[in-house]
Amino acid sequence: MWCRKKFFKYWRVLVPALLLAGLCRPGPGPAAETGGGGSVTVPEEPPLVALTFDDGPRTSTTSRLLDGLALREIQATFFLVGDRIQGQEVLVRRMAEDGHQIGVHSYDHSCISDLSRGDFDLQVGRTRGVLSAVLGSGDFWLRPPYGIIDNAGLRWAGSPVVLWSVDPEDWKDQDTGRVVGSVLSHVEDGSIILLHDIYDSSVDAALQIADALSGQGYCFVTVEQLLQAKGIQPQDGTVYRCAK
């Protein structure tokens, strides 16, 4: 079966190289003319979507989710709570080794709006420190708990701030079928989907969503990859809800 992940990888490498070499140019159809009068068929880019998960890690559910994503060759983005990382270092390292993007979701899931700079750093900077101790230095993007951040927080963020465009509120009733239906009815190219990897129902929903959208031709990427693929240069302190 065609691997959409590999299609995306090679499409991003092949097409710019051909354009740079003058061997193909954009055209109205799938075939672009070459300098020799022939043509090179350039496949259309598939629709892209980013699955994101908050509030973990949690041993049982996050492990099962990682297993399911690996089986499907899917990358996702995990926003971790700092005080839940201790004792889960092996799980967090596995996330990184599997190619997932890892970000910050505060230290203890407190709202990070209306904080002093010192308290903000205890929530965000402290969590980055925990992640760096486990993974080494890295760009750990921020997702504020409850999606709430004030202007001061944006100035202090030290990274892009990631929200979402599709929220099935999976925490409310933990109804897998409803969550899947909600996501499938709202998703589109460039969507950022919010789920939580601490519920068994959400893990079930995520894998069903992955299968359904893969069947529709979607390709799953991290948030950073999504913005890059859409030509968006992420900026520190800027909020991103989708890639359009």
What are these regions (language model features)?
Residues 6-29:
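Sec-dependent N-terminal signal peptides of Gram-positive bacterial secreted proteins and lipoproteins
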Residues 33-126, 130, 137-138:
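Active-site beta->alpha N-cap acidic-glycine motif
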Residues 36-44, 71-73, 85-86, 201-244:
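C-terminal domain-boundary segment and adjacent tail
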Residues 49-52, 76-80, 101-104, 140-143, ...:
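Structural recognition of the beta-strand scaffold that forms the well-ordered cores
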Residues 55-59, 83-86, 102, 108-112, ...:
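Solvent-exposed loop/turn segments at secondary-structure junctions
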Residues 61-64, 110-137, 148-189, 202-205:
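Alpha-helical scaffold elements lining the catalytic groove of polysaccharide deacetylases
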